[in-house]
Amino acid sequence: MKTIVLLFVLVLVFALLVKMGMVEAEHGCPDNEDECHEHCKSIGKSGGYCVGPHKQTCRCN
């Protein structure tokens, strides 16, 4: 039962991160912030930028 609850919480956290516009590094970060920006625009956001300790996460706004 604990395993199921933990799995549910992890899925919920992941879904919230996606909903907040955090997308993993495959969208140009950290080397090409313009690619991140264009990706975010392509999904209906106003743009995006690379964030995190090593700027590996594309955050859409």
From Swiss-Prot:
Keywords: Antibiotic, Antimicrobial, Calcium-activated potassium channel impairing toxin, Defensin, Disulfide bond, Immunity, Innate immunity, Ion channel impairing toxin, Potassium channel impairing toxin, Secreted, Signal, Toxin, Voltage-gated potassium channel impairing toxin. GO terms for biological process: defense response to bacterium; innate immune response. The keyword Secreted applies. Disulfide bonds join 29-50, 36-58, 40-60. Residues 1-25 form the signal peptide. One of its GO terms (molecular function) is toxin activity. The keyword Plastid does not apply. Belongs to the invertebrate defensin family. Type 2 subfamily. This is Defensin BmKDfsin1. It comes from Olivierus martensii (Manchurian scorpion).
